[in-house]
């Protein structure tokens, strides 16, 4: 029995021992946990707002006790050290605002809570504190019509002249007559100038800006919260004079505030048109983006949206013009050895430009190597001139070198030599070889044919040698050859045997009074048969003087063309003839191409005596003279055919009087010269055509405008008729509906009338029955 109990008691004792050990461990752990300090009780989490938000919430809820506790808690006490620059903590709590700048006093006025208003004012709140839009508590009370709050604020020093951001006083926001009367009475009592109060901010800004300009420094004054500059404020409120001063002082029109707004954004948002124009003129960007990616057009008021679009187009046009001018200014200029500035741009036709280009190409290889050419007057007295410079080029067109304005010019000897540099250079630059240039000053100098259809006579061998570069002169043993200048057409000298050259008089033709030429330059002097190719001297005159001189030259060039009496006398002196035979020159023809009628008179006996043998003056001689002159002028258009014409002319001249008479008889009716050879006349004709075309277009535009107005009126009438026609079915339907309603109403009234007659009959029957009953009752009562 004892043996069986032993094994059974062993497992039970082991389990008990294990439990005892576990119990001991728990006891020891509890002892250690009790000895160590515990974490304590966990505090509940709370949400704390800013003191300003809590104070605003307490005042909005009317909890004045809580507001007093907050103000008392904000007071640091008598011994605390305070920052002198910062407001007291209690005052900061009283004037605390929300995101819109609304303080507790603003909110109390909005809620019409006079008790909270009194509490805040008694505690020291700022009565004239403005929100983000510039509204004071008095603005709020006036706008809401709270008379009691307005009186209380006025009695405690509220500013009745305060102006908000829109430029409004509390009086401007008054809604009721009682409020308006209260504010007007207060304004009269205080003597406030309403207009001056509205201009006070602008005057202050203007004064500060002038002080900045006088001081020479422009401070970067910015709003501490919004970052707006003075230009932002002036643009938003339309202070144009302040903006002009700021922009003239160098204020950047692209300044940005805290939101990335430029002054143009502000002006567009508030709809200030003048400010938008001024900023756009000073480079305000129409495509400037804010931090939100908005342009001025995106923020603009509807009234200024069209203006901004127009300003954007103008800025784009100005930008394109500036880029085009810069690109033109960067084009390479053709090199020129002459540094003299051109006084004006040559007005040449396309044909003349091509001839000038060809001439400049032919002149370049040997133009600078040959000896210089002098004028006849200068060749006798003055020294050798320096070699000519290369002609200046403008857009690929060679232009003649400009003579120096400082060179001495004698008006008595050469009346038109002052303007000789204005002659067009067609072929006069291509000179013959040096050995062909003979001594100047030969006797017998005559008049040459100038650019204005004047007659000049050739007198020396030098005049014969001045020809186009491709012309080979045909020597004539008897007759001098006519000189050919640059596209200047002239007739050959008079046909004579041994006498000095004389001029064949030309009768005045009624169909063609003026012989057209290919040049518009003034006539050359009788002695200046060739151009002076001297080196131009640099002109030191100013730009304005140069332009004025060029204008005078152009005017004189138009008004002094023709041959005067002085030219004729000098030509006669040079030819050795007496001036007694010449008649006084008549007044110039008032046409575009002037001429001297006295010179063309062919009835003079002196001129008839001067004519060579067998060649008396008459219509045939004049026509032959013009024909020969036209043949001489013909090769000026194409230089290839000139040698053959020259040789043919020489053979004709050498044939004697009979050949000349046959030629005259064959060419009695020469073809008129085309007026297209005369650039000046062509310009005049073109101008007249353009003017007529403009008049025609203007009349057409006027007619079109009137027609458009008539069509608009007709369209409006048609639209009105269509609207009436469109509304007519609706009107008919409405009338039909009303008719049916009236019919129904009439039927109802008829039914009512029938019922009324029945009711009357019933009523009468009841009356009769009632009378019968009354009689029965009266009988029964007896």
Swiss-Prot record:
Any GO molecular function: protein kinase binding
Basic residues bias locations: 547-557
Biased composition, class Acidic residues, residue ranges: 374-383, 670-680
CDD domains cross-referenced by the UniProt entry: IPD_PPP1R12C
Tissue note: Ubiquitously expressed. Highly expressed in heart.
Keyword Phosphoprotein applies: yes
GO CC list: cytoplasm; stress fiber
Localization in the cell: Cytoplasm; Cytoplasm, Cytoskeleton, Stress fiber
Origin: domain of life: Eukaryota
PROSITE patterns: ANK_REP_REGION, ANK_REPEAT
Basic and acidic residues biased stretches: 349-365, 537-546, 567-583
Coiled coil feature spans: 297-329, 681-782
Biased composition (Polar residues): 323-337, 449-463
Chain positions with N-acetylserine modification: 2
Function noted in UniProt: Regulates myosin phosphatase activity.
Protein name as catalogued: Protein phosphatase 1 regulatory subunit 12C
Taxonomy of the source species: Eukaryota, Metazoa, Chordata, Craniata, Vertebrata
């Amino acid at each position: 029995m004892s043996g069986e109990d032993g094994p059974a008691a062993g497992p039970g004792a082991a389990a008990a021992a294990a439990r005892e050990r576990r119990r001991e461990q728990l006891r020891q752990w509890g002892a250690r946990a009790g000895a160590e300090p515990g974490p304590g009780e966990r505090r509940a989490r709370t949400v704390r707002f800013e003191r300003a938000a809590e104070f605003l919430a307490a005042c909005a809820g009317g909890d004045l006790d809580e507001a007093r506790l907050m103000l008392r808690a904000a007071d640091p006490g008598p011994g605390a050290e305070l920052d002198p620059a910062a407001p007291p903590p209690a005052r900061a709590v009283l004037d605390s605002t929300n995101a819109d700048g609304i303080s507790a006093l603003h909110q109390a006025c909005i809620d019409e809570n006079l008790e909270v208003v009194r509490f805040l004012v008694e505690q020291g709140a700022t009565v004239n504190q403005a929100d983000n839009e510039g509204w004071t508590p008095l603005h709020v009370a006036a706008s809401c019509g709270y008379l009691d709050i307005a009186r209380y604020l006025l009695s405690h020093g509220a500013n009745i002249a305060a102006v908000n951001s829109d430029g409004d006083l509390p009086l401007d926001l008054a809604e009721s007559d009682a409020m308006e009367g209260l504010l007007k009475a207060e304004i009269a009592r205080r003597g406030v100038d309403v207009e001056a109060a509205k201009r006070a901010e602008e005057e202050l800004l203007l004064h500060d800006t002038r002080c900045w300009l006088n001081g020479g420094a422009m401070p970067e004054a910015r709003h501490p919260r919004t970052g707006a500059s003075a230009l932002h404020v002036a643009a938003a409120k339309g202070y144009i004079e302040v903006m002009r001063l700021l922009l003239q002082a160098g204020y950047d029109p692209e300044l940005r505030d805290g939101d990335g707004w430029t002054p143009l954004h502000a002006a567009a948002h508030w709809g200030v048109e003048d400010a938008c124009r001024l900023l756009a003129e000073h480079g305000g960007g129409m495509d400037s983006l804010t931090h939100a990616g908005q342009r001025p057009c995106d923020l603009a008021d509807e009234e200024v949206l069209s203006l901004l679009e127009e300003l954007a187009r103008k800025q784009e046009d100005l930008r394109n013009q500036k880029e085009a001018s810069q690109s033109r200014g960067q084009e390479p200029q053709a090199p020129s050895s002459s540094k003299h500035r051109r006084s004006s741009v040559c007005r040449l036709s396309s044909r003349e430009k091509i001839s000038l280009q060809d001439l400049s190409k032919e002149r370049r290889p040997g133009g600078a190597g040959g000896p210089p050419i002098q004028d006849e007057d200068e060749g006798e007295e003055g020294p050798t001139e320096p070699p000519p410079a290369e002609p200046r080029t403008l857009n690929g067109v060679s232009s003649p070198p400009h003579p120096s304005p400082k060179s001495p010019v004698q008006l008595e000897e050469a009346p038109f030599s002052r303007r000789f540099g204005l002659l067009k250079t067609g072929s006069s630059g291509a000179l013959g070889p040096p050995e062909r240039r003979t001594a100047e000053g030969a006797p017998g100098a005559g008049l040459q044919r100038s650019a204005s259809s004047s007659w000049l006579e050739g007198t020396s061998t030098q005049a014969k040698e001045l020809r186009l570069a491709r012309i080979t002169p045909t020597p004539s043993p008897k007759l001098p050859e006519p000189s050919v200048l640059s596209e200047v057409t002239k007739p050959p000298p008079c046909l004579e045997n041994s006498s000095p050259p004389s001029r064949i008089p030309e009768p005045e033709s009624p169909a063609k009074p003026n012989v057209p030429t290919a040049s518009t330059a003034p006539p050359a002097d009788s002695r200046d048969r060739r151009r002076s190719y001297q080196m131009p001297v640099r002109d030191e005159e100013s730009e304005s003087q140069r332009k004025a001189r060029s204008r005078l030259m152009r005017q004189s060039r138009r008004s002094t063309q023709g041959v005067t009496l002085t030219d004729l006398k000098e030509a006669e002196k040079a030819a050795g003839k007496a001036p007694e035979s010449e008649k006084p020159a008549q007044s110039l023809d008032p046409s575009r191409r002037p001429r001297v009628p006295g010179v063309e008179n062919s009835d003079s006996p002196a001129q008839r005596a001067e004519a060579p043998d067998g060649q008396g003056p008459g219509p045939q001689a004049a026509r032959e003279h013009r024909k020969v002159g036209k043949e001489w002028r013909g090769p000026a258009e194409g230089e290839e055919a000139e040698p053959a014409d020259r040789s043919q002319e020489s053979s004709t001249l050498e044939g004697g009087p009979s050949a000349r008479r046959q030629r005259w008889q064959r060419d009695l009716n020469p073809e008129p010269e085309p007026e297209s050879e005369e650039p000046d006349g062509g310009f005049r004709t073109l101008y007249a055509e353009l003017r007529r075309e403009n008049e025609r277009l203007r009349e057409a535009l006027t007619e079109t405008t009137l027609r458009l107005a008539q069509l608009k009126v007709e369209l409006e009438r048609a639209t009105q008729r269509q609207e009436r026609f469109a509304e007519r079915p609706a009107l008919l339907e409405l009338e039909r509906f009303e008719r049916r309603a009236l019919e129904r109403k009439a039927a109802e009234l008829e039914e009512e009338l029938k019922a009324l007659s029945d009711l009357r009959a019933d009523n009468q029957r009841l009356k009769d029955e009632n009378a019968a009953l009354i009689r029965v009752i009266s009988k029964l009562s007896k």
